[in-house]
Each structure stands twice: as C-alpha cells, then as structure tokens.
C-alpha cells in the first residue's frame, strides 16, 4: 500500500505521522510512504481540499492508496484497525 503524507515543517502531528509511517515501512513489506512538504512543493490548502474532496483545515493530511484518511489521529486509528500495528 502506498501512503502519502502532506505536511509542513514545524508541525508536531506531521512528525508523528511520518514516524508512524517510517515504523510501518520498516516492519511491513507491503507498506511504502512518501512525505510531501506542502510549503516546499507550493501546495495550497485549496489543493489539499480538492484532493481530499472536502474541506481541510490542518496538516498532516494523509492518503492511503489515494483514499483520504484524514490527520494523524485518523491515520493512527486506521493503522490500528487495519494493520494491527
């Protein structure tokens, strides 16, 4: 599964999401992730809203296999429910 984390520097929840994704990628052969710094890439809130298909107010915004999961708390819950990590 391919996970994309849209975040920014200085965001503690972005760091947590990246750390969890790194842990999963080290433990599982079927998990890969990409971290995208929205400031460095010039991605706007409107761009994220369009990709998510709904309003977004915070980062990180996380997608698994192109499905919008939400922020860090949503991602951690998704991992617990789907991957037992």
From Swiss-Prot:
What are the cysteine partners in each disulfide bond? 11-14
- Report the outcome of residue 16 to A: Partially abolishes AMPylation by YdiU
Key word Phosphoprotein present = yes
Q: Which GO terms describe its cellular component?
A: cytoplasm
One GO MF term, please?
protein-disulfide reductase (glutathione) activity
Q: Which SUPFAM superfamilies match?
A: Thioredoxin-like (SSF52833)
UniProt-reported outcome of changing residue 10 to A: No defect in AMPylation by YdiU
Which NCBIfam families does the entry link to? GRXA, PRK11200.1
The family classification in the record reads:
Belongs to the glutaredoxin family.
Indicate what this protein is called per its UniProt record. Glutaredoxin 1
The organism's lineage is: Bacteria, Pseudomonadati, Pseudomonadota, Gammaproteobacteria, Enterobacterales
